[in-house]
């Protein structure tokens, strides 16, 4: 584990990882760090807190463990580190899902629709 501080471009750091872990335990929306990791095709281990289960589906796009369960977190990390095929399939599914549901083009289309709606409102 290496804490590298704040960086304007996280993609090179994410690409250097084997597994991304976000052990949130309270008050989460949809974490941008998780979305960035998933969009880079990283297999992720996270918790079932807040809106995290929206992009992270256990066994499909990520491994989800109960919040504050250190043993479950450890087991999920060990499982992914030991299984390259599982890392690849979860990472690919994560990227496909995040790009399809939260990709830049989709977000821009949604924002444009909101602006049009706001301008047309009485």
What kind of feature is each model-predicted range?
Residues 36-37, 45, 73:
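Short hydrophobic faces within alpha-helices
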